[in-house]
């Protein structure tokens, strides 16, 4: 396979649609248990960007065959982080092509000597195309950032005498093309009076910086050779009882026994089961409720799965514990229901974005963001515009923050992006998203795209197929995409369960004219609802605001203008939110980095918080509104009386 093209995927050879190890089996979050161990590889890795003209030197010289430092200089690179903002090298910040990471690891002796132990290498995210070598052996490839992939490397570490070190080499290409998600194009600038020979730029069609690298944790973990591969849980409610339906996949042997226990928050066993599938009934159930919707939100049970099996080397056992929230989701023509009760999304859109670390996962930032969400009175957010780290989803389960889980289908702006290769890849990405996040009670809806060119006929077929595929993967949740098209021309809207609309009245349209917002917003809602008869979420609205800019009367880019724009939107939303508008998500939670342009001052400034998480004036306005909305319907019902409506769609 030819690899290492400067800017195009064509030289990579055929993409591995599902044949790579990283796309097989389950994707349970790694955890330690009596049968499992984890070894995190976060920290400093050796790093090199391939600045050669064709970006292929690393493959031509086979950098993966020996330690990276032997083939040239390396620098320290923290993992997890984006590589772009770590150094003072301007070339690296805007680099397009292959970068190389390497780390040497000493393994515990038991991992290499006990043949009943399976050793797995897991990469939380590598944006965007990754090739992995272990001790110079080509082990794994994966296309697409923002999602985990892994490989069983037991046969590489359990050979001969104990290897003193394990060398992991990862090459990552961040090039975006018409068949990647998100898509992009490469433009060669050939006027030699302005540009040197071979000069090119990466064009993107989305408004956030294309950070890249090992942006989430890398780790090794073990399981027995016969192991719990995957668990799928769906829940429902029957009078005052909760029903937990489970399916368990086991790999490595057909001779095994499974025991299942469901424990409540006090670690008391409330139900038992056996076998690979079954139903657990929980009398007097404590439901999983969103934040501010119940006096005890985010109630989680623990599903404990114990496997015992016979192998040729003797008996083995495996243990895995899955948090379970028992709740229902349903959609009617005018309501979004959680546990049979109307739910109103009052929340934010976010980005995984911060100073220095870029899109790199960071625990302090995560906790700070959730503290701000709760202070704000937000009960929901959309993972705009890609799946967030698994730790984020776990926090949502624990805190009761509802999630619209969006894939990286952003920037689908050109007709050539709606091709069969892209469609195949998009459907596979949705498989990976659902596989990873299907058991999170906080996830109540899938979003397959943001602002696609949904007025195109080709987009209509494309979206129809992706939505249908997602529904086949998970019939228990509604599916949407986020539109900014005209209601009469949108070819994808007939296939969604909930209409999600982005509009920027008085900003991108009729900018400066705050007095038009209420009329234009009312017209928008009425047109969409009359045509489609589906609940509507105002999925984006907002205004660019430079913290500390003030002007009265309000002028654009000032804090006063952002506040005034929000106030006008809120008046318009209040006219419809007791009818068929079921949510509002501000754009954006915090300022974030974008590509440089004459219209962006160090990034997008539509946040109600700065990039450093300090509030602008609008944050206090939004906090007052969200707490007011929450208090209108706060704790109006008991758990025992909460049931999903019989005529709802997703039970």
From Swiss-Prot:
Keyword check for Repressor: no
GO biological process: carbohydrate metabolic process; chondroitin sulfate proteoglycan catabolic process; glycosaminoglycan catabolic process; heparan sulfate proteoglycan catabolic process; hyaluronan catabolic process
Effect of residue 626 to H: In MPS7; very mild phenotype
Annotated signal peptide: 1-22
A Pfam family the protein falls into: Glyco_hydro_2
GO MF: beta-glucuronidase activity; carbohydrate binding; protein domain specific binding; signaling receptor binding
Key words of the record: Disease variant, Glycoprotein, Glycosidase, Hydrolase, Lysosome, Mucopolysaccharidosis, Signal
Modulation of this protein's activity: Inhibited by L-aspartic acid.
Compartments in which it is found: Lysosome
Glycosylation sites: 173, 272, 420, 631
Family listed: Belongs to the glycosyl hydrolase 2 family.
Subunit organization: Homotetramer.
PANTHER family linked to this entry: BETA-GLUCURONIDASE (PTHR10066:SF67)
Name the UniProt record assigns to this protein: Beta-glucuronidase
Encoding gene (name): GUSB
């Amino acid at each position: 396979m030819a690899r290492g093209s400067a800017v195009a995927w064509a030289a990579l050879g055929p993409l591995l649609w599902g044949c790579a190890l990283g796309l097989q089996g389950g994707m349970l979050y790694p955890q330690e248990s009596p049968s499992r161990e984890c070894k995190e590889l976060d920290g400093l890795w050796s790093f090199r960007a391939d600045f050669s003209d064709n970006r292929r030197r690393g493959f031509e010289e086979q950098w993966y065959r020996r330690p990276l430092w032997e083939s040239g200089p390396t620098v320290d690179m923290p993992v997890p982080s984006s590589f772009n903002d770590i150094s003072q090298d301007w070339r690296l910040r805007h680099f397009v092509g292959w970068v190389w990471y390497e780390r040497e690891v000493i393994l515990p002796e038991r991992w290499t000597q006990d043949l009943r132990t399976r050793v797995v290498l897991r990469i939380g995210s590598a944006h965007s195309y990754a090739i992995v070598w272990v001790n110079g052996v080509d082990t794994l490839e994966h296309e697409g950032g923002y999602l985990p992939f892994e490989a069983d490397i037991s046969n590489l570490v359990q050979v001969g005498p104990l290897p003193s070190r394990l060398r992991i080499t990862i090459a990552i290409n961040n090039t975006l093309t018409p068949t990647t998600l998100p898509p992009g194009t490469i433009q060669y600038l050939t006027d030699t009076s302005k540009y040197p020979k071979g000069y090119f730029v990466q064009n993107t069609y989305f408004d956030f910086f294309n950070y890249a690298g090992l942006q989430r944790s890398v780790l090794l973990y073990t399981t027995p050779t016969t192991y719990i591969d995957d668990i799928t849980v769906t829940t429902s409610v029957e009078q005052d009882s909760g029903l937990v339906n489970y399916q368990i996949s086991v790999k490595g042997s057909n001779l095994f026994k499974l025991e299942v226990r469901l424990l409540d928050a006090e670690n008391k066993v409330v139900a038992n089961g056996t076998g690979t599938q079954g139903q657990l009934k929980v009398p007097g159930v404590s439901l999983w409720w969103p934040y501010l919707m119940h006096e005890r939100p985010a109630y989680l049970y623990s599903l404990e799965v114990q496997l015992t099996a016979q192998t040729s080397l003797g008996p083995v056992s495996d243990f895995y514990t899955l948090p379970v929230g028992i709740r229902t989701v349903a959609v009617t023509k005018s309501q979004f229901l959680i546990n049979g009760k109307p739910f109103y999304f009052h929340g934010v859109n976010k980005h995984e974005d911060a100073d220095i670390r870029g899109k790199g996962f960071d625990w302090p930032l995560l906790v700070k963001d959730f503290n701000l969400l709760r202070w704000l009175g937000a009960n929901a957010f959309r993972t705009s515009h890609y799946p967030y780290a698994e730790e984020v989803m776990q926090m949502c389960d624990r805190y009761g923050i509802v999630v619209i889980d969006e894939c990286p289908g952003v920037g689908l702006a050109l007709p050539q992006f709606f091709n069969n290769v892209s469609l195949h890849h998009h459907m596979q990405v949705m498989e990976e998203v659902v596989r990873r996040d299907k058991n999170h009670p906080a996830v109540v809806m899938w979003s397959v795209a943001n602002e696609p060119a949904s007025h195109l006929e080709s987009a209509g077929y494309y979206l129809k197929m992706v939505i249908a595929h997602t529904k086949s993967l998970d019939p228990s949740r509604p599916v949407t995409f986020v539109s900014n098209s005209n209601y009469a021309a949108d070819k994808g809207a007939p296939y969604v369960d909930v209409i999600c609309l982005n509009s920027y009245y008085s900003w991108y349209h009729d900018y400066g004219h705050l007095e038009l917002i209420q009329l234009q917003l009312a017209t928008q809602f009425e047109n969409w609802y009359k045509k489609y008869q589906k609940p509507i979420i105002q999925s984006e609205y907002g205004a660019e605001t430079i913290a500390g800019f003030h002007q009265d009367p309000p002028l654009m880019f000032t804090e006063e203008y952002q506040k005034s724009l929000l106030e006008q939107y809120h008046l318009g939303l209040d006219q419809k939110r007791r009818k068929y508008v079921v949510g509002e998500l501000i754009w954006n939670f915090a300022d974030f980095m974008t590509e440089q342009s004459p219209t962006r001052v160090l990034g997008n400034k539509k946040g109600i918080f700065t990039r450093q998480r300090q509030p602008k004036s609008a944050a206090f306005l939004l906090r007052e509104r969200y707490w007011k909305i929450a208090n209108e319907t706060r704790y109006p019902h008991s758990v025992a009386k909460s049931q999903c409506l019989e005529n709802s769609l997703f039970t």
